[in-house]
């Protein structure tokens, strides 16, 4: 060790344990445009002050450890440490706080969602001084955004590829999700597409099982796509799930899809992992494939209000990692999703600049600097009676996906697809004529059903189906 290094390392070093807040709680800090900002919902253990809890989060997710180490003297901690710069109590909750942490950009590898999450939500979530910890939102600086490719194509390029404008796209998940042979699966795809849907979909756990190997499924689905395209004159697609046990196998499946000439593949991005997802997104852009993203496993991470990570963070991460569609809840169906919260992260997926809006759960203004947008997919327990609400809530730039709401039609798959297409066209026309979908939705569907026996049959089957459960994850009540 040189004398110069020895002197620097030894000056001011005192072994032992010191409070995190002495180093990592800096309320005077002015955040920089290049900082990654995080909003954490922190529930400290009894007796732990909020300043110490917030500082502990900043420390353990950046440069800190449980004790003072002499190697701190070999670098500039002030340059690299995370800082808890603001703390606010959560209204209506005892001993719970929103702690804001700023991270210098040098802590993160360029173009790596994996590295970003490893730092920010790594070991800190198991920290004993905290009863619970949840990452509510991130502000990703434009300097870091620019190191990512983002979605393979984005909303406008997808519409141009499909030649479909002025309405939401329609999809359907093939059911039963497991157990069909490849040929019967392809037949179900064909019936749905010829009936008027734009897409059909592999379910998230359809990979390559003994009853249906992936290559057989790809071949029969490609045949269904081309046959339905020839009959309808519309471009069709099926989300071929390329998720696999290894990245190499995943890319091999995507290559097969490209060689078959189909327009879109699919990935389970949380179970598959961000490294695999980013690799697939790059392949899709280079080879002209659209990429549909399923969020299987998200509720393990995001459903509990006090611990984990909010889906808006996972949605931002997906836009950076890459995907052209992602499942985003329905508000009206069988899966979790409160309206204001859902619309908040739907805008984060689609828009270029999203302003801070705590009434929708958005903690920071986010500028995507022209990164392509992602189409939100509404899927799960929806049927024709939901069509007006879905059209009003999600607007044109969305995919409305009816699985049971297509395949459960009493006359079969194709009539089920016809019913959904007629309902959608009726809602879009009514909206364009200035009618109020929220108020007149049922009347609009009834009027359309007079001219479509398929829609009339669907209306009769699902007239009493509702999912009246309260959302678990709700916005905080404002302080009175």
Curated annotation (Swiss-Prot):
The modification N-acetylproline is found at residue 3. Keywords: Acetylation, Calvin cycle, Carbon dioxide fixation, Chloroplast, Disulfide bond, Lyase, Magnesium, Metal-binding, Methylation, Monooxygenase, Oxidoreductase, Photorespiration, Photosynthesis, Plastid. The modification N6-carboxylysine is found at residue 201. It catalyses: 2 (2R)-3-phosphoglycerate + 2 H(+) = D-ribulose 1,5-bisphosphate + CO2 + H2O; D-ribulose 1,5-bisphosphate + O2 = 2-phosphoglycolate + (2R)-3-phosphoglycerate + 2 H(+). Coiled coil: none annotated. The active site is at 175 (proton acceptor), 294 (proton acceptor). The keyword Lyase applies. The record marks 334 as: Transition state stabilizer. Mg(2+) binds at residues 201, 203-204. It is an enzyme of class 4 (lyase). The basic functional RuBisCO is composed of a large chain homodimer in a 'head-to-tail' conformation. In form I RuBisCO this homodimer is arranged in a barrel-like tetramer with the small subunits forming a tetrameric 'cap' on each end of the 'barrel'. Heterohexadecamer of 8 large chains and 8 small chains; disulfide-linked. The disulfide link is formed within the large subunit homodimers. This is Ribulose bisphosphate carboxylase large chain. It comes from Gossypium barbadense (Sea Island cotton). The lineage of its organism: Eukaryota, Viridiplantae, Streptophyta, Embryophyta, Tracheophyta. The gene is rbcL.
């Amino acid at each position: 060790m040189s004398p110069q290094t020895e002197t620097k390392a030894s000056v001011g070093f005192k072994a032992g344990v010191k409070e995190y807040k002495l180093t990592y709680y800096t309320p005077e800090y002015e955040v920089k445009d290049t900082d990654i900002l995080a909003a954490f919902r922190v529930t400290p253990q009894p007796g732990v002050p909020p300043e110490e809890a917030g500082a502990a989060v900043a420390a353990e997710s950046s440069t800190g450890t449980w004790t003072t180490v002499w190697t701190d003297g070999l670098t500039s901690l002030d340059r690299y440490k995370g800082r808890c710069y603001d703390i606010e109590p959560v209204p209506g909750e005892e001993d719970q706080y929103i702690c804001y942490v700023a991270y210098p950009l040098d802590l993160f590898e360029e173009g790596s969602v994996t590295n970003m999450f490893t730092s920010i939500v790594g070991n800190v979530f198991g920290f004993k001084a905290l009863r619970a910890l949840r990452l509510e939102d991130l502000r990703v600086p434009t300097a870091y955004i620019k190191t990512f490719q983002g979605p393979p194509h984005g909303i406008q390029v997808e519409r141009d590829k499909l030649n479909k404008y002025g309405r939401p796209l329609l999809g359907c998940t093939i059911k039963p999700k497991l157990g069909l042979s490849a040929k019967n699966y392809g037949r179900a795809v064909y019936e749905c597409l010829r009936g008027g849907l734009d897409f059909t979909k592999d379910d998230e756990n359809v990979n390559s099982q003994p009853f249906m190997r992936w290559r057989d499924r790809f071949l029969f689905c490609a045949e269904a796509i081309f046959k339905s395209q020839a009959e309808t004159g519309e471009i069709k697609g099926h989300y071929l799930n390329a998720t696999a046990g290894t990245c190499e196998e995943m890319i091999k499946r995507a290559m097969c899809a490209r060689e078959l000439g189909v327009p879109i593949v699919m990935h389970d991005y949380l179970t598959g992992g961000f490294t695999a997802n980013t690799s697939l997104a790059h392949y899709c852009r280079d080879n002209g494939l659209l990429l549909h993203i399923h969020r299987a496993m998200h509720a393990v991470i995001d459903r509990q209000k006090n611990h984990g990570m909010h889906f808006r963070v996972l949605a931002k991460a997906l836009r950076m990692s890459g995907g052209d569609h992602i499942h985003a809840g329905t508000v009206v169906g069988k899966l979790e999703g409160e309206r204001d919260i859902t619309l908040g992260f739907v805008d984060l997926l689609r828009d270029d600049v999203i302003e801070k809006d705590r009434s929708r759960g958005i903690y920071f203004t986010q500028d995507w600097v022209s990164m392509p947008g992602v189409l939100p997919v509404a899927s799960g327990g929806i049927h024709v009676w939901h069509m007006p609400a879905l059209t009003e809530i999600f607007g044109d730039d969305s995919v409305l996906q009816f699985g049971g709401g297509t395949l459960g039609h009493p006359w079969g798959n194709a009539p089920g697809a016809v019913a959904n297409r007629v309902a959608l066209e009726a809602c879009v026309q009514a909206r364009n004529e200035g009618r109020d979908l929220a108020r007149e939705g049922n009347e609009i569907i009834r009027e359309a059903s007079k001219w479509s026996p398929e829609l009339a049959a669907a209306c009769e089957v699902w007239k009493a189906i509702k999912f009246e459960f309260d959302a678990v994850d709700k916005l905080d009540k404002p302080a009175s």
